[in-house]
């Protein structure tokens, strides 16, 4: 019941995905051969959300892995959990996308997309009641961004009523891997606004800060960053996989978090974040969790929620705790910081409680917020985009693959519209609405 199909694309997506499956296997007591070696029936009760049971009692992840070059996939395959995936579900090309969105979306990626869709279709047909898809990718490169968005739009055509959730790694403000990141990211956002239902916005710099400041790691690796992401990913779906007192699923999440269809870019956070050494020395309380998960330093993307307002938010608690306490704490946050919530959406914080905590913790919580301050991310990418596009820098790489400059202009204006929409709702107040109504009534009287 309620299966989720996981898709990972490009180098970044595959590395996050590999880490994610380590976390999920750990939670469900699956070892690296796919055999169950856990100690609780609860681990098996809804294991079919993420796993297919194959012959001989092996559990195979419902995962599709794609890339345009074989390198990252080989390292996933030879990694600790590489043998657990279905070999047919590795779909890869040889040529690579070379950080070029057009190659991923129009040329190289388009040649490979049908074989990816076949695998997706095969996995979807294996599902009893498919709830939706979760896609891991980055927006700065070529494959994850170009081919990732192509796949999302194709899946959208074929499964229009299923949820589409993405974990998208945005280019960081100060750290840049490639010079054309702003192009790739803008073209991708243009697609994600239209075709995805929910986007969890991540970025490396914010993750580095968390590792460095909060976790006290001297030299964080991508592995550490990906571990943070996968903790959040696991938290988002824990209610589907374990029994809870207050359930949520992808669709409930969307209904509670998205007031206007285009504004579906969320900030995510996770608590407790404590350095590996100090974990066993403290007992966590619900107030501590709540305080940490609402903390701006805890957000996994480089936007500061204090610069905007929350349209909506959702908190998923895991562990044995009283729902009364959870409700009190959430109410407390809203009352104390009421200026950071828009007043024209009452009760805009949803909470859910799942009884089973992640391994090694007594309780944990995942935070998802729809804040207008996310526009900082888009604004920053847009500025970098404009700076290059004004000079038509690097454009020949894209036009050479058959793209038109018009497409860039469209993507740019779509992104600017998005920023403007967030700004509009940030400034909106409850009185605006009433004034409008007042005017209309007067007009009617005059008429």
UniProtKB/Swiss-Prot annotation:
One of its GO terms (cellular component) is microtubule. InterPro entries: Beta-tubulin_BS, Beta_tubulin, Tub_FtsZ_C, Tubulin, Tubulin/FtsZ-like_C, Tubulin/FtsZ_2-layer-sand-dom, Tubulin/FtsZ_GTPase_sf, Tubulin_C. It comes from the Eukaryota. GO terms for molecular function: GTP binding; GTPase activity; metal ion binding; structural constituent of cytoskeleton. Mg(2+) binds at residue 69. GO terms for biological process: microtubule cytoskeleton organization; mitotic cell cycle. It is found in: Cytoplasm, Cytoskeleton. The keyword Metal-binding applies. Residues 429-447 have a biased composition (Acidic residues). CDD domains: beta_tubulin (cd02187). Keywords: Cytoplasm, Cytoskeleton, GTP-binding, Magnesium, Metal-binding, Microtubule, Nucleotide-binding. Induction: By gibberellin and brassinolide. Down-regulated by abscisic acid (ABA). The keyword Ribonucleoprotein does not apply. Its main location: cytoplasm. Its cofactor is Mg(2+). Residues 421-447 are annotated as: Disordered. Pfam families: Tubulin (PF00091), Tubulin_C (PF03953). Expressed in roots, leaf sheaths, and suspension cultured cells. Dimer of alpha and beta chains. A typical microtubule is a hollow water-filled tube with an outer diameter of 25 nm and an inner diameter of 15 nM. Alpha-beta heterodimers associate head-to-tail to form protofilaments running lengthwise along the microtubule wall with the beta-tubulin subunit facing the microtubule plus end conferring a structural polarity. Microtubules usually have 13 protofilaments but different protofilament numbers can be found in some organisms and specialized cells. Tubulin is the major constituent of microtubules, a cylinder consisting of laterally associated linear protofilaments composed of alpha- and beta-tubulin heterodimers. Microtubules grow by the addition of GTP-tubulin dimers to the microtubule end, where a stabilizing cap forms. Below the cap, tubulin dimers are in GDP-bound state, owing to GTPase activity of alpha-tubulin. PANTHER family: TUBULIN. Belongs to the tubulin family. This is Tubulin beta-5 chain. It comes from Oryza sativa subsp. japonica.
